[in-house]
Amino acid sequence: MTPARRALLLAAGGVALGGWSGAVRAGSQVEEPLADSVRSALSAAVADSGAPPKLEFRHIDERLAFLRWLGAMSPRLAKRKPEFNVRREFLETVWYEARRAGLEPALVLGLVEVESGFRKYAISSAGARGYMQVMPFWARTIGDGDASRLFHLQTNLRFGCVILRHYLDRERGDLFLALGRYNGSRGQAPYPTMVLGARRRWEFKDGPTGAVPSAATTPSAPASRR
């Protein structure tokens, strides 16, 4: 680990310990040319059947693990989303979309905190929309062209998670660079520092070993939504 990266991670820990107390000026994802194969893959990844979402689990242990996570996250989010049903729907969708894209739910929650402060209809000065501040050009590039759908809960989280996964793949797994690219500030420390710090506040330890459940340690998504 380089000294600069070590300093970044220490700073992220400091942000987490100090708490979050201010608005963030969201950057803007940069529209870049996409190869046809990449565009097709991303379009397929964000495709939505439009059916009502329903979590399904292969084993009872997976369901119990999800319920423990949900029980831990719900109180943490209560001040931001006081209505229980709204809060539960949001967390269920984060859980599914994060793991569908091979991301940690804690990372997605941290990014949402920094990007929008958990405001569904947030709009940045650059025009980014919704919880994960997705730029409208993505709706045209890999979606159906309707940018207003980016305010829909599942659509916004699906686009955001797929885009972050795309950037992680482009950066060969380097989270620091991928987060910077997501914000339009690749190579600069402030934004990744804030997201990494926020992620700390949404981590969940489960099981006898105290391991933090991670999409990276799960070969496939544990649940499906229909």
Annotated model-derived regions:
Residues G27-Q29:
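Boundary of Sec targeting at the N-terminus
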Residues S49-R226:
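Catalytic glycan-binding domains that act on GlcNAc-containing polysaccharides
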Residues E32-P33:
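Extreme N-terminal leader/anchor segments
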Residues M1-V15:
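N-terminal secretory signal peptides and thylakoid transit peptides that target proteins
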